[in-house]
């Protein structure tokens, strides 16, 4: 029998998970960066102080990288408060999750631990194991030289070999390096041709110091760029006349691709309609995987109101999530209907505009008699205010008490004032979402927010996700680093 305390704990964990998925401490449409950070810091301190085991278990869920780093840092800072068994379990989760983070973020975490003087044995062991697992220490030494050197010092680790040690601590002492990448870096100081064999971020500094024209540099460094760098720079490269910098859009992750599409002017989207739509649909099919076409009849209510602009630092992020969810739901469903709050029916030309008439769109969606209704919105229903909550209440309590239609609200925006994502109705489960690729898992998680979920059930779910994470042996996030050293992905 669940106690009242267990029910409160389950609700607290779900609230924190929603925050950890969506919040990044950056400015949102309705809240400043300071408000976001203050709210998020309180939640982390509250969870760590009251539910340490569950707090660590959240690492196994699809929380964003910003909150992964915050969780890891707080767990390592408070190692003395954990039991031996807790430290063992936390260490395994931390190691598994760090392996999935981009290297720059991990190095920034190590730097923060060094500045905070967190240097216990467990911290040094985690740093040692992560550094030992890096596929190419020479690449890290060139690309992240200062951070790499600081991490070795903090963890009391020697570099892997005398040559790497010389490169890190006295790089100009040698007249020649045997490691090809280190030798390329040495030659790039006086040979312009050598810089094009370096990773883009390193070569860019050499090019600026040597006065290489931007267009020439971008044309020649293009084969060394990672997929993300190519996507980010291709429009800038075109403006400089470097036409060879072209990203393979069919290989891009869905949400990142949606952000890129929305960054283009409307006339460019019209001109490239076939290319962009094809790439979005291909990414959606990859994300759907074995669930493709198995969700039955699905209707989505998608928020493209003015608040979907987000903020200057998260420009159009809520709208990008909605656009990506639109294409993913189309791949998951056997029969799919999309209803945008603006009333537009051309998703490719979406842009943030107007109020948020969620209530009216939900009525239209329920008229289609779907087996699943998915609402992707920041929850600021304002045309008229409160209509969505009343529609959902009447639907759930009067018209569909048997729950023939599954309704879930996915919210990409953290509400700092409420310490959670903004909910539309107590009768409908709400989950935070950051990347559309996580949609299926989040719909699964949202079921715990429906009704009064017990702590035992939620704990079992976290343990199952932790087992899945620990069983994973591949590190997908190292691919871009290997590409930067060995060339572009085919």
Model-derived features with residue positions:
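An N-terminal, globular interaction/scaffold subdomain
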Residues: 28-165
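Acidic/polar low-complexity segments with low predicted structural confidence
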Residues: 115-292
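Alpha-helix capping and helix-coil boundary motifs
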Residues: 12, 101-102, 226, 253
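Generic intrinsically disordered, low-complexity segments enriched for polar/acidic and small residues
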Residues: 1, 13, 26, 39, ...
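Generic hydrophobic segment detector
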Residues: 48, 55-65, 73-76, 88, ...
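Acidic, glycine-rich A-domain
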Residues: 1-87, 266-476, 480-490
């Amino acid at each position: 029998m669940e106690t009242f305390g267990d029910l409160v704990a389950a609700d607290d964990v779900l609230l924190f998970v929603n925050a950890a998925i969506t919040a990044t401490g950056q400015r949102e449409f309705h809240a400043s960066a300071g408000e976001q950070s203050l709210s998020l810091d309180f939640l982390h301190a509250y969870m760590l102080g009251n539910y340490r085991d569950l707090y660590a278990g959240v690492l196994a869920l699809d929380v964003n990288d910003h909150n992964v780093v915050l969780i890891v840092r707080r767990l390592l800072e408070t190692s003395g408060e954990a039991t031996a068994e807790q430290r063992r379990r936390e260490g395994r989760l931390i190691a598994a999750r760090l392996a999935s983070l981009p290297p720059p973020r991990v190095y920034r975490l190590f730097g923060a631990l060094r500045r905070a003087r967190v240097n216990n044995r467990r911290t040094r062991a985690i740093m040692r194991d992560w550094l030992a697992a890096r596929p190419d220490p020479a690449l890290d030494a060139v690309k992240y030289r200062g951070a790499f050197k600081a991490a070795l010092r903090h963890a009391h680790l020697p570099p892997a070999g005398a040559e790497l040690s010389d490169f890190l601590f006295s790089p100009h002492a040698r007249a020649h390096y045997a490691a090809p990448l280190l030798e390329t870096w040495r030659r790039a100081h006086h040979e312009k041709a050598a810089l094009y064999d370096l990773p883009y971020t390193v070569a860019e500094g050499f090019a600026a110091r040597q006065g290489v024209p931007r267009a020439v540099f971008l044309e020649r460094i293009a084969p060394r760029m990672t997929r993300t760098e190519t996507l980010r720079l291709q429009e800038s490269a075109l403006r400089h006349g470097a036409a060879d910098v072209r990203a393979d859009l069919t290989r891009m992750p869905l949400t990142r691709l949606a952000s890129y599409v929305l960054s283009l002017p409307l006339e460019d989207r019209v001109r490239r309609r076939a290319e962009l739509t094809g790439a979005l649909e291909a990414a959606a099919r990859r994300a759907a995987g074995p669930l493709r076409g198995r969700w039955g009849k699905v209707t989505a209510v998608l928020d493209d109101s003015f608040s979907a602009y987000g903020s200057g630092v998260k420009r159009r992020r809520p709208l990008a999530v909605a656009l990506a969810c639109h294409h993913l739901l189309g791949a998951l469903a056997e029969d799919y209907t999309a209803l945008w709050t603006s009333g537009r029916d051309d998703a490719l030309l979406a842009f943030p505009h107007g109020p948020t008439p969620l209530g009216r769109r939900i009525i239209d969606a329920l008229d289609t008699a779907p087996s699943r209704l998915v609402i992707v919105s920041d929850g600021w229903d304002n045309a008229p205010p409160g209509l969505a909550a009343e529609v959902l209440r009447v639907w759930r309590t009067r018209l569909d008490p048997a729950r023939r239609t599954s309704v879930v609200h996915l919210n990409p925006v953290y509400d700092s004032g409420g310490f959670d994502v903004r909910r539309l109705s107590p009768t409908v489960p709400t989950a935070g979402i950051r990347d559309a690729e996580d949609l299926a898992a989040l719909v699964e998680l949202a079921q715990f927010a429906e009704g009064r979920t017990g702590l035992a059930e939620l704990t079992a779910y976290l343990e199952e996700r932790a087992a899945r994470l620990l069983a994973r042996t591949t590190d997908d996030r190292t691919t871009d680093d290997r590409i930067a050293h060995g060339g572009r992905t085919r």
